[in-house]
Amino acid sequence: MANRGGRHARTEETENAINYVQCDGLAVMKMVKHCHEESNNMDLAQGALLGLVVDKCLEITNCFPFPKSGDETMDEEMYQLTVMRRLRRVNVDHLHVGWYQSSDVGNSLSLALLESQYHYQTSIEESVVVVYDTQKSSRGFLCLKAYRLTPQAIQMYKDGDFTPEAFRNLKVGYESLFAEIPIVIKNSPLTNIMMSELNELLPEDKGHNFLDLGTASVLENHMRSLIERVDELYQEAVRYNKYQQVVFKQDTEKHRALAKLAAENAVRTSKGEPTVSEEEVIKQFRPMPVPARLTATITSGQINTHAQHIAQFCSQSLAKLFITESLQNAKEAKEIK
């Protein structure tokens, strides 16, 4: 995945290094174009973000796509360095400040996303990941969000410990893996003038389909994804419950063996014989490896995201239904008159 970095000097993570992200309209259009092109092929679009940091504001001024992973002859790191070197020659911002990727059905949180952002954020302190939801944007809602790993998530990855105890000690949950950074889009005055002129050229019957009710496929996709994630979380819960049962059984057998050894040692002591150390019994019971809970945490976050999207979608659809009903009643009343 996108575990590439333009700078390799490792820096210490500081909290609230970036207050908000400012993205140029040109960079947004290039990201949108790339993500929609790849979505037609059911591929995940990824690319690099270029810009600079000014007073805790990350300004994204340009971007370029990563080569497709299927091309084995392509040296991805050399490709990025070559692109940034050529941008520098034409006096374009060439500092690597993060990466972007597409998302479908709001399902952006994944293990690959966490790993990639960890590599970026530990090598480029101010880096962010920008996620573009192609499906939601295609319905007329520009969905562009910027995220950074929280200090707790960074520390957890550095320790490499994903056990339940580590999650509890660091107070890490699916809601605290990423911190969303506010993102604003800035256009030049000339761009704003052009947008105003294009808006006047738009036909009146275009761009106003706000009461479109043909959105059953959106809810269906969200529900299907939600069911799949719930099933995955159930399988994770079954595996963890089996681990707990094995640990409980092992502890019971160990306590029984230690109690038996204590009784035997008491008899040996009364006979003046040497006792057997408890270490001999403990060695027979090897500790069970604790299963990692990172996958279950990510799956829980995906379930929460789908549930929020379904709730938002249903509330919007209900509002459309009530508005449409009122308009239909008004139309029928007018026809009767």
From Swiss-Prot:
The keyword GTP-binding does not apply. SMART domains: JAB_MPN. Keywords: Cytoplasm, Initiation factor, Protein biosynthesis. Coiled coil: none annotated. One of its GO terms (molecular function) is translation initiation factor activity. The keyword Nucleus does not apply. Residues 21-153 form the MPN domain. InterPro entries: eIF3h (IPR027524), eIF3h_C (IPR045810), JAMM/MPN+_dom (IPR000555), JAMM_MPN+_peptidase_M67A (IPR050242), MPN (IPR037518). One of its GO terms (cellular component) is eukaryotic 48S preinitiation complex. Pfam families: eIF3h_C, JAB. Its main location: cytoplasm. It is found in: Cytoplasm. PROSITE patterns: MPN (PS50249). One of its GO terms (biological process) is positive regulation of Notch signaling pathway. Component of the eukaryotic translation initiation factor 3 (eIF-3) complex, which is involved in protein synthesis of a specialized repertoire of mRNAs and, together with other initiation factors, stimulates binding of mRNA and methionyl-tRNAi to the 40S ribosome. The eIF-3 complex specifically targets and initiates translation of a subset of mRNAs involved in cell proliferation. Component of the eukaryotic translation initiation factor 3 (eIF-3) complex. The eIF-3 complex interacts with pix. Interacts with mxt. Belongs to the eIF-3 subunit H family. HAMAP family: eIF3h. This is Eukaryotic translation initiation factor 3 subunit H. It comes from Drosophila willistoni. The lineage of its organism: Eukaryota, Metazoa, Ecdysozoa, Arthropoda, Hexapoda. The gene is eIF-3p40.
